[in-house]
Amino acid sequence: MSTMPVSLMDIVVNGYGASLRKKGNRFVLDHGGEVQEFSADMVRQFILSDSVSITSGAMKLAAEKGIDIVVLSRSGMPVCRVYPCEPCGTVTTRKNQLAAASTAAGYLLSAAMVSAKVTNMANLLAALGKSRNNHDLRSAAEEIGRLADAIPPEGTPSMQGALIRGIEGRASRVYFAALSLVIPPDLYRGRRSQHPAEDVFNAYLNYCYGILYNEVEKACILAGLDPYIGFLHAERYGKRSFVYDVIEQFRQPVVDRMVITLAVRGRMQREDTDERWYLVGEGRRKAIASTLQRLDEERVIGGRTTSFRSAILENARSIVNYLNEGAVFEPFVYRWG
């Protein structure tokens, strides 16, 4: 069994055969006689992977304490989560979210989030180009910046949705091609590959995006948003399409910069994946620990000291204010020094 109390609040259980049960106000992890206990007052979230069993008593205690329990697939995506039955937010929020999905209000929100993603890609490449004095990286950043400027300022999801998805796609192709100037070729083939990945770098991206998705989904639920009512990714029927909308703002600041650092500093190896390019063992542990650390590290964002985890929740709450009160929505744009 491998358990990692990454912080006082996040407990990662990564091992076959582990069990989680309740003992008074404590959680007990047991694997083959190796026992660890955690006070329920000190836990924010349990992240479970592989085959882990959990008792109903442990789930009830977690619900009473507002503790999130999420189960990850081998690709890092959450496949289920346990949270209290009491609904978060109001009916008004979800009604307004559903109404906005087909109106100009929904388009403005989704366009702002795509613009933030494209701008973040440009900003990251510009920072990499500056630190490496690389003209090609800076040129790619400028090309992506021009694509961000091409996003129409007005429209509806049905009228302009395909256009801004196309802009996002072109920007992504330029961005991931440019990363081949930074990532060693034995780790990265110069293009984005998802499920399955085609190389170690994409395997890390996939898994870490899954952990980020978990955090964004949780923020949407806490803010009272419906994860299934999406604007830009509305075509993903049966999927949590709104989570895919919101996450776009955070991919480069939270995950990409971190995974690039792992690659260029020699902390990423072929042995971190299996023959089908899924992270295993030490690779999975590095991905989880690095992403959670990245989420919790304090940094200056928007002129004040906070964390990416807090910024994600604040972003979800600002979406609620936009939908319910018509407040100005400022998407999450990150600038590297």
Q: Where in the sequence are the language-model features?
A:
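Active-site helix-to-loop segments that bind/position phosphate- or nucleotide-bearing substrates
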Residues: 1-23, 30, 37, 79, ...
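Short, well-ordered turn and helix-capping elements at secondary-structure junctions
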Residues: 31-33, 50
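An N-terminal structural lobe/cap that precedes and organizes the functional/catalytic core
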Residues: 33, 42, 63-65, 71
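Extracellular/luminal Protease-associated
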Residues: 40-54
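Short gly/pro/ser/thr-enriched loop/turn and capping motifs at secondary-structure boundaries
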Residues: 55, 75-81
